[in-house]
């Protein structure tokens, strides 16, 4: 969503971390993992100052079930690339206007969700909380009941079609309740730092038994 600019700061931090030639941790991760990165899913919406839609007026995170090239070309081409390359891990980065927390929403509503799926989600969330005190696991969206996943959303579509850990990361617009910084609130440097932690947690996830 183009109005959720904290996601752009997160992405800038992620790219800086991954591409830093002096970072031994990122070099080790890149030896094992190939990252396919979409820096901005909605450049037209960003350029036009939209909150949630692209130039055609479509909310792209409700177009993943059957995107059309004339309405949601951004989703269409990314879905095609995913089908061609495959997906083993997926993180969709957003901001939430109402909840003053950093949290992750999983896709528990998928019909095939099982104990293994839950263990993967729990491992990643808990590891991220260990790495970064700005992230927490106590507050977030309530999980959907089995069979009620929204497959028009990126996480639901990817989790359903690729059977991988698929998540949505949400960050606050103003500040975090548990770790507030009143002088700056939730800002670019904190978004970047969270990106670094997310990537470290990716490596730990693939090192763990739960990712198998």
Regions found by a protein language model. Give the residues of each.
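Active-site/substrate-binding loop(s) of hydrolase catalytic cores
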Residues: 1-151, 156-184
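His/Asp/Glu-rich mid-to-C-terminal helical/loop segments that flank catalytic regions of hydrolases
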Residues: 176-212
